[in-house]
From Swiss-Prot:
This is Tetratricopeptide repeat protein 36. The keyword Nucleotide-binding does not apply. Gene3D superfamilies: Tetratricopeptide repeat domain. TPR repeats lie at residues 49-82, 83-116, 121-154. SUPFAM superfamilies: TPR-like. It comes from the Eukaryota. Keywords: Repeat, TPR repeat. Belongs to the TTC36 family.
Length: 202
């Protein structure tokens, strides 16, 4: 499973103006959904796969992407029907500039997750971000909508940014606030004399 830290890395790359470390959330429902999905696997093999993923995340945090990808690939080979390692490898591939490979892994993660739990939500968010970077806003919007339905606040923020009407309203509001601050092109001076009494005393 992606840690908040390695998700924040991707978040910072795509969204440098958004506060760092607020990429995605996990709740009790997510934990239960993940437990249900992981219950299909042998506990011993599952533990090995999770250990490999942790090693991969540590390597990625040390900027050793080659080792990270190797560890995630080993986890996938061990449990090819588990979505989490595809998610993690997709992020490492994206950080290496392999967008095609990242999208292939994310497509697989979405399918394997059944569009549920943390793995499904994170795959949709990551894929949506890549699609948005590629200018495929309609496809990105669909992924963000599904991720939002799974409880991702970050996906909800992306949907607002992709809404042309919201963008227009934001522009109009900004212009209106600017006019209120500077009526007739003149800035309002705080503490400026405005009363007749003040004028007479001047």
């Amino acid at each position: 499973m992606c840690t908040p830290n390695d998700l924040a890395v991707l978040h910072a790359i795509f969204n440098p103006n958004v506060p760092f470390g607020n990429f995605d959330e996990q709740n009790v429902g997510d934990t239960e959904a993940n437990a249900d999905l992981d219950g299909r696997f042998s506990s011993a093999i599952l533990q090995q796969a999770q250990d490999l993923e942790r090693d991969g995340v540590k390597a990625a945090e040390s900027e050793d992407m080659a080792t990270a990808i190797l560890k995630f690939s080993e986890a996938i080979a061990l449990l090819p029907e588990r979505a989490s390692a595809y998610n993690n490898r997709a992020q490492a591939l994206r950080l290496q500039g392999d967008v095609k490979g990242a999208l292939e892994d994310l497509n697989q993660a979405v399918e394997l997750s059944g569009i549920a739990g943390v793995a499904g939500r994170q795959a949709l968010v990551q894929r949506g971000l890549i699609l948005r970077l590629q200018g495929k806003d309609d496809e990105a919007r669909k992924d963000f909508q599904r991720a939002a339905q799974l409880g991702s606040d970050f996906a909800k923020q992306q949907l607002i940014l992709l809404n042309p009407y919201a963008a227009l309203c934001n522009t109009m509001l900004r212009d209106m606030m600017q006019k209120l601050r500077e009526p007739n092109g003149h800035k309002i001076q705080v503490g400026a004399s405005t009363s007749l009494e003040d004028d007479r005393e001047a």
